[in-house]
């Protein structure tokens, strides 16, 4: 049957002009909340009338079918089959290809569930995908009917449809078991069932929610008969497999020995655009994009259209400037290290058909909505964190399956590049032509030693091989056991049942039972859990065994086992700090940072910088080269309070055993930014991590949330309150994509992760903006004290203070003074002033930063006007009328 819908043309920004993944793709765009309006309301009618009764399954199916028909969407056979199975109360495993409308089936399931009065869940593996689907569902079901839970974000959590990460649902299932209010679940990207670290969260709900209807979705499932049989056994309901749908857009494959630039040129000439070029590192993706940008990828008309569509996007960061140039040439970049606003822009431009080429990583395979015609694989190997290896069949099909745009293409194209040495050999052969003598003289290049290679047979084997059977994963942790104990009753028996009924091998089950025994023993010995035998009732048989009851003796923290499981430890550890200490605020920040997930790319850059400094110092001290190499292995990034925190955590784990599931990770990212007076842009520049600025932003957002939500008010001094305001200001200013999307959905107040902003004020967050400007100016003082004139020139060239002008200014300073001080007095508010008199009329602050000298003359400094609008838009201090020198000269100017 024909169909005009696809789940590959989804928009991540409601109202952006592209279709929602749940709204039917190229069908008529749904009016806001039009499908949700067909369901009886979950809320008390405003007019005081009686709520309408819930629909029957048949009625719910008919209403959904009518909604799709009214919008010109004709369901494919496999979609209708799956929806009818769901309406009949069966489970469905939907293993159809990418682009075959799985999202529309999921929407039907969620609608039919809520219309029957069932609470429904949509789960996905990553927060970005959860967020995307949340906004898509809001568009078609209405704002009141959809909520989101990701551990750090809670929106409308009482809604009938909840979008969440798989771990959220798994923890609820452990905590509530059969009594959980979970009517139906659509599990997207179900191949994560086999993920070694996270697969447990996909298996646990299937084992512990016997009254829940499931739909398991993925384009690369492989053999799922064992999963289907297990689901039927646990729930008593039939599990239907819908796995034989044809690809709506068939694929063709080509293995090429041309250079990547040549491959792209040939594909463009052959009308095979848009292309997504897959790399297995972010650096490689950017390198290719920069190379291709010089090849005239886009026409003048395309470049103009891209420029128009990108209006309103701020490209203020270092990577942003690179991306702006690349987009202007028709080349996009897409990977996880980018700021969200840049990724969303690239996706939006792709959805509008404006980008001929996108260079990205294999994140393409994780549900992102980038409609493309051709996938080009630059390699058939990847580094998996341990070693280089060839792609597995599932990985290959996840990526290759994104080729071909339903509703646009008659076929999709998948191209694999040969290894570089094979491409070179092909060039030599082509140059020799048919001349036997020249052919004999060719010295073929070999793969480098240790290189994991591939060839055409590798490619063909991947095409023909079905995805591997999903290997089930299960683990037992202190947190999981605690959650099960919360139910009351015989928690150990329930954990035994969880293990015994799982799909693990007998050997794995035996190991899990031993682990469960160890955890229960630890929890009981520590007094956190008590085990009680309840005697049988008087009328029970004489051989009746006593009932066993496990109970907690402590109150669990709110949001236990979610995204910040070490928050209780942080609260306890704060008592170790002396509020009167000069380092109190920075030490508190270090404690917070130790509980956060590592931003690995940032820490690697810190370690590189530390090792470079150490090598230079050892070389200057005359240390022999071999010894330098040996010593350098012990040099790493800063880990403040490491010994204090490790000792405190060991003691804490004795009292709170479930903390053993987690690890502290001392580091200094936020602290380093503060101590070096760096703003976001300056810190990126300092470490040379422009390609990972999205990683830094996410880390700072987590740090802000922890400081703002976890640190008690009584533990916050004035300095810390300033820092929290500044950090929130920076995070919102650098990238407010999530806030913007929610505003587009109509209700900015519901996003509790965003601190409130002022209304009708030029400066929305005065405290945060003030600290941002103070830090920016004191960073210049610090750089001047260290005589880092080149860095000063790079910071201030845009407002007239080049490296040469800074050098002249500092030369003049040092004719009068020996040094520039950077101690506590130099950083104090007495050395910094703001004149706000023109804030409302001109949207500027007049600022003055004094340099502290050894004589206390305080006669040199920086004066300038802060552009408040640009500063708040970009999250960095933007100046006008900026000058440096002796104050009497500046005042004359």
How does the language model describe each region?
Residues 851-893:
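Compact beta-sheet-dominated globular domain cores
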Residues 65-67, 72-249, 256, 274-299:
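Conserved P-loop/Walker A NTP-binding site and adjacent catalytic elements of P-loop NTPases
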Residues 374-377, 381-383, 389-430:
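Conserved segment of the helicase C-terminal RecA-like domain
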Residues 254-280, 287-290, 344-353:
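Conserved interdomain hinge at the start of the Helicase C-terminal
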Residues 2-3, 8-21, 332, 351-352, ...:
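Non-catalytic terminal extensions of ATP-dependent helicases
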Residues 1-84, 88-92, 297-328:
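Helicase-associated low-complexity/disordered flanking segments
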Residues 121-123, 131, 138-147, 282-357, ...:
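Conserved C-terminal RecA-like helicase domain
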Residues 158-173, 329-341, 349-369:
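Conserved two-lobed SF2 helicase motor
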């Amino acid at each position: 049957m024909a169909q005009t819908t696809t789940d590959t043309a989804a928009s991540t920004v409601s109202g952006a002009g592209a279709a929602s993944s749940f709204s039917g793709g190229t069908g008529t765009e749904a009016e806001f909340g039009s499908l949700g309006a067909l369901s009886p309301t979950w809320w008390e009618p405003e007019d005081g009338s009686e709520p309408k009764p819930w629909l029957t399954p048949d009625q719910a199916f008919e209403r959904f079918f009518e909604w799709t028909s009214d919008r010109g969407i004709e369901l494919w056979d496999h979609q209708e089959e799956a929806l009818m199975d769901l309406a009949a109360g069966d489970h469905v495993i939907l293993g159809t290809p990418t682009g075959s409308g799985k999202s529309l089936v999921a929407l039907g399931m969620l609608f039919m569930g809520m219309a029957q009065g069932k609470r429904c869940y949509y789960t996905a593996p990553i927060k970005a995908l959860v967020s995307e689907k949340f906004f898509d569902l809001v568009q078609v079901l209405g704002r009141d009917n959809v909520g989101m839970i990701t551990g750090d974000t809670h929106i409308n959590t009482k809604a009938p449809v909840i979008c969440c990460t798989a771990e959220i649902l798994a923890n609820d299932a452990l905590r509530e078991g059969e009594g959980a209010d979970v009517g139906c679940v659509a599990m997207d990207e179900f191949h994560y069932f086999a993920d070694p670290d996270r697969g447990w969260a996909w298996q646990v709900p299937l084992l512990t929610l016997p009254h829940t209807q499931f739909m398991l979705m993925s384009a690369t499932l492989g053999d799922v008969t064992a999963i289907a049989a297990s689901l039927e056994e646990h729930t008593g309901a039939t599990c239907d497999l819908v796995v034989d749908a044809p690809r709506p857009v068939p694929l063709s494959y080509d293995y090429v020995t041309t250079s990547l630039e040549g491959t792209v040129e040939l594909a463009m000439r052959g009308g095979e655009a848009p292309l997504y070029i897959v790399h297995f590192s972010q650096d490689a993706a950017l390198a290719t994009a920069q190379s291709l940008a010089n090849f005239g990828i886009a026409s003048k008309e395309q470049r103009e259209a891209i420029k128009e569509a990108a209006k309103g996007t701020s490209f203020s960061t270092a990577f942003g400037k690179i991306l702006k140039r690349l987009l202007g040439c028709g080349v996009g970049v897409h990977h996880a290290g980018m700021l969200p606003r840049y990724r969303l822009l690239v996706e939006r431009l792709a959805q509008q058909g404006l980008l001929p080429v996108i260079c990205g990583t294999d994140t393409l395979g994780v549900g992102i909505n980038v409609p493309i015609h051709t996938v080009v694989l630059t390699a058939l190997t990847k580094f998996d964190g341990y070693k280089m290896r060839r792609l597995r069949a599932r990985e290959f099909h996840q990526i290759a399956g994104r080729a071909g745009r339903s509703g646009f293409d008659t076929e999709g194209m998948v191209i694999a590049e040969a290894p570089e040495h094979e491409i070179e050999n092909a060039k030599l052969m082509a140059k020799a032509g048919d001349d036997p003598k020249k052919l004999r003289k060719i010295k073929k290049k070999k793969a480098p030693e240790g290189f994991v290679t591939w060839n055409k047979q590798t490619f063909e084997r991947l095409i023909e091989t079905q995805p591997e059977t999903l290997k089930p994963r299960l683990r037992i942790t202190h947190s999981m056991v605690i959650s099960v104990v919360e139910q009351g009753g015989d928690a150990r028996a329930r954990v035994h049942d969880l293990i015994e009924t799982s799909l693990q091998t007998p050997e794995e089950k035996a190991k899990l039972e031993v682990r469960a025994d160890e955890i229960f023993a630890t929890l009981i010995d520590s007094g956190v859990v008590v085990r009680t035998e309840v005697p049988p009732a008087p009328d029970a048989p004489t051989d009746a065994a006593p009932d066993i009851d496990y109970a907690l003796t402590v109150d669990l923290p709110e949001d236990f086992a979610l995204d910040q499981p070490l928050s209780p430890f942080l609260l306890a550890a704060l008592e170790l700090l002396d509020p009167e200490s000069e380092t109190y605020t920075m030490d508190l920040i270090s404690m917070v940072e130790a509980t956060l997930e590592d931003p690995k790319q940032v820490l690697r850059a810190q370690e590189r910088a530390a090792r470079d400094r150490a090598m230079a110092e050892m070389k200057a001290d005359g240390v022999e080269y071999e010894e330098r190499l040996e010593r350098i292995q012990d040099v790493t990034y800063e880990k403040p309070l490491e010994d204090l925190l490790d000792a405190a955590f060991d003691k804490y784990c004795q009292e709170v055993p479930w903390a053993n599931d987690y690890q502290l990770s001392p580091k200094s990212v936020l602290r380093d930014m503060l101590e070096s007076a760096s703003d976001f842009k300056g810190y990126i520049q300092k470490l040379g991590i422009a390609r990972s600025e999205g990683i830094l932003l996410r880390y700072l957002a987590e740090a802000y949330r922890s400081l703002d939500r976890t640190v008690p008010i009584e533990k916050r001094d004035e300095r810390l309150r300033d820092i929290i305001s500044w950090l929130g200001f920076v995070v919102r200013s650098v990238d407010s994509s999530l806030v913007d999307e929610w505003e587009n959905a109509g209700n900015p107040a519901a996003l509790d992760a965003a601190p409130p902003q002022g209304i009708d004020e030029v400066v929305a967050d005065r405290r945060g903006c003030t600290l941002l400007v103070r830090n920016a100016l004191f960073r210049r003082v610090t750089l001047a004290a260290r005589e880092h004139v080149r860095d000063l020139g790079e910071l201030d060239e845009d407002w007239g203070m080049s490296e040469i002008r800074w050098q002249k200014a500092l030369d003049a300073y040092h004719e009068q003074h020996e040094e520039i001080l950077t101690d506590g007095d130099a950083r104090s508010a007495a050395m910094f002033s703001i004149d706000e008199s023109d804030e409302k009329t001109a949207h500027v602050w007049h600022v003055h930063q004094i340099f502290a000298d050894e004589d206390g003359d305080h006669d040199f400094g920086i004066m300038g006007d802060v552009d408040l609008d640009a500063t708040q838009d970009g999250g960095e201090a933007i100046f006008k009328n900026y000058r440096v020198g002796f104050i009497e000269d500046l005042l004359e100017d």
